[in-house]
Amino acid sequence: MSAHESFWFKSLRWIQKQLVHTIVVPQDPFADLNLDPSRPLVYVMKTESVSDIAALHEITGKLGLPSPYQMLEIDGIKTPRVVCLEGRKPLFGKRDSNEPFLQTFQQLLALHRQQQELDIQLVPVSLYWGRTPGKEDDTMRAAVLEREDPTWLRKCLMILFLGRHNFVQFSRAVSLRHMADEHGTDKRIAHKLARVARVHFRRQRKVMTGPVLPNRQAMFHALLKSDNLKKAIAEEASSKKISEEKARETAIQYLDEIAADYSDSLVRIAERFLTWLWNKLYKGISIKGAEQIRQLHHDGHEIVYVPCHRSHMDYLLLSYILYYEGMVPPHIAAGINLNFWPAGPMFRRGGAFFIRRSFNGNKLYTAVFREYLDQLFAKGYSVEYFTEGGRSRTGRLLAPKTGMLAMTLSSVIRGIERPVTLVPVYLGYDHVMEVATYHKELSGKKKEKESVWQVFGAIRKLGNFGRGYVNFGQPITLQNFLTEKVPNWREEVGEDPEQKPSWLTPVVNALANRVMTRINDAAAASSVTLSSMVLLASEQNALERNQLERQIDLYLSLLKSVPYTSYASVTEGCGKELVDRGIELNKLTETKDDLGTIISIDDSLAISMTYYRNNIIHLFVIPSLIATVMVRHEEVSREELQELVAEFYPLLKAELFMGVTDLPAYVDALVECFKSEGLITGDNRLKLVDDRINQLLLLAGVVGETLKRYAIIFNLLGEQPRMERADLEHHSHRLASRLGAIHGVMAPEFYDKKLYALLSSKLKDLGYLSDKADGDKVRKIRDHANGLLRSSVRQTIIETLNQEQDD
């Protein structure tokens, strides 16, 4: 009988099982790490430990992976399923040598030399009992519980106190066949593997626990000694005619207002609360792209998360997901409005640092904040901030606020050695609890000040909110971005590091636009967003169930056949299943009669559902534009279709932060998908299929409100080509209000003055709005926009314009 089958070992494992709760990273190793169940597998661990292997045994049984106690047998030769770099550490004396590790590796390499078809997967496994990074001023608790290589006595204490926070992390498998073919199979290679594995485990631990936590007061004193803050304090004293000591006290007050006070203990408590909260609120959280972010951390990147901002839940959701995905929750830039009791102190201990909405020319505050941000980057803490500056009230991305991006880029320019990488993050929900409040604010109600009563009120209303979605977009490494935009930026900055480069502002603006585009590139199409997309394009926000299911199936086919990007995600299931989910979430209403079943959006929810549609409208706006062209013209050449789409795309791109890199190829792929779905026929001459016109009409409805806006703007410019930008925004908004009232447009963004301001800015960039504007170009796009509208809508615009001129 082997040792692990003895009564003693089984008893120890049973006791440990009662004390330990294990979280697996990633949650599905087969899918996330591409493990091949048909190939032999060997686990590699850093240190031999009875308790670690017992914890691994419990998890492998649940995941369907081989047990670490099960020997690997190949052609009658048995080898251990687990190899450890280091032997056990005794209570006294030296740890065992790593000779067994080297012998096992040499044996495995020899098997590959003898059998050319053999390919064993080496899977590194890291175990953590708690994730405390330690502090710069180490405590007795840290000395007992936070050692990287504990003795068996310390390990017993760790299991007792930290067993409920046990993490088992699997890493991407290494092919021993590849190692043998590339590097040979002698003893030297076994030593090399050991060195590489040690580096891997050291980096992996840093990713899981993060850098050591600073003493807050010691950090303040260190920051106050920096040259930049000394200079700012002296200038503050001089400009306000106060003593430097008084200015220094003000700087300390600013630091105390701003700085986080991260507590690992609070994070562990919050993890339990948030697990309860998510299980009560959501039926699951869909995550895409976490592995690439783990790899960036592993490679030593300084990570800055830049998510979209839908809800106050965003602060909690991303940190929770990162924690469960084996990464350290970031330090989050939170608005000072959230610094209210008791949430403010808890947010601060959870890693939030607070920022004023406006610095108002306060040079000392600006200097303090910059130095604090530089310190976070220098110490290696990941950071998170919302580039929109506030929560979106319409479901679309807001125009970015560039302040934090500018400060981050300035930190890079001042000489951060490690690569600093922005990670765009798309956050989505089947239900956003603040949506009703957003629409009240858009209709003119004053925004309520955040308070503890709002929090209690929200918790009281907790219910079934469906699923949450966290998609990580394509990262942007800032050093590479700077080189792309300003190839010789290092040389220019080196000449005078204190001088703001002339190119910084346009580069920051370009960076902000790329961040927003890559957030939208990672959008998540869900049951709620797809159902709202279809029903809001129908006449009365209602369709026969079969028709709704077919339309959703069409949209699913478009998204899967012609992916918007590889970072976007599409919910699982078919049209029928997605409609069922919408009904279950009380987003859709089902009405049955003798003729069948009608699915509708209740009138009280119609405006709210535009929010969810807007989350993914950019995924469908070009397919919708193609459908509109086919419905209005019935027959069109492929070349004419390409020209029409290309004409409107710059405006769509600016408004919706779209990132289609090869527009003609994307349009051609969509045309082929339309043909395969039976919506249109032809090759060079494209014709709509009459029997499928209802599906095309519903799809065309997605871009309908957008085309109305463009028609308003270009009809105004057609009448007055040299109209001032402010006048264009004013008259566009007035005309939109009238058009919406007559034709029942209820989407809040249709009346959003900020959207018309954004469009007028882009029109100026494109040459439509200037003293030298090309009148023929303006009239051409006006005629095309008018030609894509229903005649009644077009007539309303023209009559209203004529009436204004008569007045």
From Swiss-Prot:
Membrane disposition: Peripheral membrane protein
Any one annotated GO CC term: plasma membrane
One Pfam family, short name: Acyltransferase
GO BP field: CDP-diacylglycerol biosynthetic process; fatty acid metabolic process
Motif (HXXXXD motif) on chain: 308-313
HAMAP family per the UniProt record, alphabetical: Glyc3P_acyltrans (MF_00393)
Family recorded in the similarity comment: Belongs to the GPAT/DAPAT family.
Name of the protein: Glycerol-3-phosphate acyltransferase
Principal localisation: membrane
EC number: 2.3.1.15
Catalytic activity: sn-glycerol 3-phosphate + an acyl-CoA = a 1-acyl-sn-glycero-3-phosphate + CoA
Domain notes: The HXXXXD motif is essential for acyltransferase activity and may constitute the binding site for the phosphate moiety of the glycerol-3-phosphate.
Gene Ontology terms for molecular function: glycerol-3-phosphate O-acyltransferase activity
Subcellular location: Cell inner membrane
Keyword Lipid metabolism: yes
Pathway the protein acts in: Phospholipid metabolism; CDP-diacylglycerol biosynthesis; CDP-diacylglycerol from sn-glycerol 3-phosphate: step 1/3
Keywords: Acyltransferase, Cell inner membrane, Cell membrane, Lipid biosynthesis, Lipid metabolism, Membrane, Phospholipid biosynthesis, Phospholipid metabolism, Transferase
Keyword S-adenosyl-L-methionine: no
Signal sequence, start to end: none
